[in-house]
Amino acid sequence: MHMTDVLPAGDISKAVEAFAAPDSFNHKKFFEMCGLKSKGPDVMKQVFGILDQDRSGFIEEDELCLMLKGFTPNARSLSVKETTALLAAGDKDGDGKIGMDEFVTLVSES
């Protein structure tokens, strides 16, 4: 499954382009711009499944770094600062990774 199977390609492109500059990523604005925030939990879970590249049931720090690439392959990687901030925002139980429920909460609260 590809991200464009669940979200409009145009919205994804606009969102990724808006945060092309290093250290410009804002997860709240990104989730809104790509259209994910307005979707229900089922779509959010599909997106989680795409971002969880190793199928561990969690999005770990190395996968968070590649999050924009999960939306479109030619996107940049997140910086260490951006990755750390995203993990801090989403990791509600402090285990160093983001589970599916945490991801849905992260997107919904954005």
Curated annotation (Swiss-Prot):
Ca(2+) 2 binds at D91, D93, D95, K97, E102. One of its GO terms (cellular component) is cytoplasm. One of its GO terms (molecular function) is calcium ion binding. Ca(2+) 1 binds at D52, D54, S56, F58, E60, E63. InterPro entries: EF-hand-dom_pair, EF_Hand_1_Ca_BS, EF_hand_dom, Parvalbumin. Residues 39-74, 78-110 form the EF-hand domain. Transmembrane segments: none annotated. The keyword Calcium applies. CDD domains: EFh_parvalbumin_alpha. It comes from the Eukaryota. Keywords: Calcium, Metal-binding, Muscle protein, Repeat. In muscle, parvalbumin is thought to be involved in relaxation after contraction. It binds two calcium ions. This parvalbumin has an isoelectric point of 4.97. Belongs to the parvalbumin family. This is Parvalbumin alpha. It comes from Aquarana catesbeiana (American bullfrog).
